[in-house]
Amino acid sequence: MEIYKKIYNSLLKLKEKNPLIHHITNYVTVNDCANIVLAIGASPVMADDIREVEDMVSIASALVINIGTLNKKTVKSMFLAGKKANELNIPVILDPVGVGATKYRTSIALELLEEIKFSVVRGNISEVKVLSGMNASTKGVDAESWDETNPIEERIRLVKSLSEKYNAVIGITGEKDVIGFKEEVYTVENGSSIMAKITGAGCMCTSVIASYCGAEENYLQATLSGVVSMGIAGEIAYEKTKNLGPSSFRTALIDSIYNLEESSFNERGKVYNA
């Protein structure tokens, strides 16, 4: 199909460019995010000191802002780097980890969205509902089970409305992913349930999306490519480790991202127009 050819072409562009992806992220998943960026074909840098973030983002091809482990210093760095990236037309990707869990976390996420132009926002259904002003509960940094059962039609409406509000690509990832920019929306049904058994699967997905954004000017195409790549890699990794456990799966996930081929998308892709 044409859509899988586009995804593979985006992957080839990424590998050829080897974009530098600047992360201001959390210290729980930082190593996995760095490794998956390397595996997909980009280069990671995890600089968050306020004295260098503007210089670092100036040489990057994309910036990830991940609010998983907030503190005063990194919050200041997020605003500085995000605004500098906007000045230089460098895409900024937001991962609003656990938004809704505390008032502080929610206020920071909303302030970031108000002061920085984000190209992409990726979160689970509970996080996106909070950003949309809806009532939602998060279980720490995970989506609540009742949010996960929301009809796909509601997720599509959320993506469209939040995309209009922030003029950004919105990605809701979960059992069924919804990715869209305004009226152009796709659903993706790739992935494995064991991805919920490792910490950082969502963070890694955001890093893969950012890697594509660093080489692909169409950020909807980049986001779709990132989500599909993670989902297919998750399926392959599960097949290789289904008799083992989550730790083996995590290693196999990074290996599977590294080994993605054109046939991976053509044979396994489950992308649908919404």
Swiss-Prot record:
Its EC number is 2.7.1.50. GO terms for molecular function: ATP binding; hydroxyethylthiazole kinase activity; magnesium ion binding. Transmembrane segments: none annotated. Pathway: Cofactor biosynthesis; thiamine diphosphate biosynthesis; 4-methyl-5-(2-phosphoethyl)-thiazole from 5-(2-hydroxyethyl)-4-methylthiazole: step 1/1. Keywords: ATP-binding, Kinase, Magnesium, Metal-binding, Nucleotide-binding, Thiamine biosynthesis, Transferase. HAMAP family: Thz_kinase. The gene is thiM. This is Hydroxyethylthiazole kinase. GO terms for biological process: thiamine biosynthetic process; thiamine diphosphate biosynthetic process. The lineage of its organism: Bacteria, Bacillati, Bacillota, Clostridia, Eubacteriales. It comes from Clostridium tetani (strain Massachusetts / E88). ATP binds at R122, T173. It catalyses: 5-(2-hydroxyethyl)-4-methylthiazole + ATP = 4-methyl-5-(2-phosphooxyethyl)-thiazole + ADP + H(+).
